[in-house]
Amino acid sequence: MVHGPGESLEPDVKRLTFVVVLLSVGVIVSLSGQQPSFRAGVDIVSLNVTVTDAATHYITDLEEGDFLVFEDGIKQNVTFFSRRQSPIALSLLLDSSASMEEHLSVLQQAATNFVHKLKSNDIAQVIDFDSRVEIRQGFTGNQAELDTAISQLAAGGSTSLHNAIYIALKELRKVRAVNEEDVRRQALIVFSDGEDTSSLVSFDEVLDLAKRSETSIYTIALRGSDVQAKGFREAEFVMRTLAQETGGRAFFPAKIDDLNGVYTQIADELASQYTLGYTSANPRRDGAWRRIVVQLSRPNVTPRTKKGYYAPTVR
């Protein structure tokens, strides 16, 4: 089944409810049962996979057998698969630096429209950043509270982009599941109109934390009049790299009025993902980077997920 941007998505379900985190506890999922079981000492690698065709339409009718997962070139045994989307814990980062003054109302409206697309069991936080980073609203499922937080943005100051992403990733780490009903996919959506100018945290530190997280990062960088300027090239590199490494997507709208459509595309993507998980065939607990490749048996479609993960270390 093919879904284009803006369509209502009601993916079929293979009922397996447990996703992501709890790596320190470990999860074993029985493909024949309704609920996963927990087993200490087992580490599950969880993947949120987006599949598109050549026209970038989302493909939502694939089966478990259509997916092949490789870690460092070795085929892995998929132990859970689901087309049903678990709830989301979402961090919404909004650039409120001085250069955003004339565009801020459009950004606020687009961000508000986006949070209204969240489901009742999703939670989100709102962070705005200029020369400082402020958590306007902690994680909540209350849309009125999210609306209020977005409406409070005021433009001023420089751009602490790296600081904001770093803090948001740290906040997402605090969203811990007590049981399988509490488990959430994690996503971070960051909008900025320029390069970082005032962060204390380096891009390398941000990238390392992102690669160690379970978070898909979606980046939106507004193109200025001079896309060849050094500042924009640096911002584009940061935004594109974070998205590619974490299985998210980078957007570079030419006009601020394109923002609403961009946020709609992100909402559609989050509603179209598959969740796969496996226990690595590599038993070493060496903390090394392990590269992941997902392939599909169906021709002319492309999967996208995070590039890899760091192996656990000895407890």
PLM regions and their residue ranges:
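Scaffold/interface architecture of coatomer-like assemblies
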Residues: 32-315
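Positively charged n-region of N-terminal signal peptides that target proteins for export
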Residues: 10-16
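Bacterial N-terminal signal peptides
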Residues: 17-30
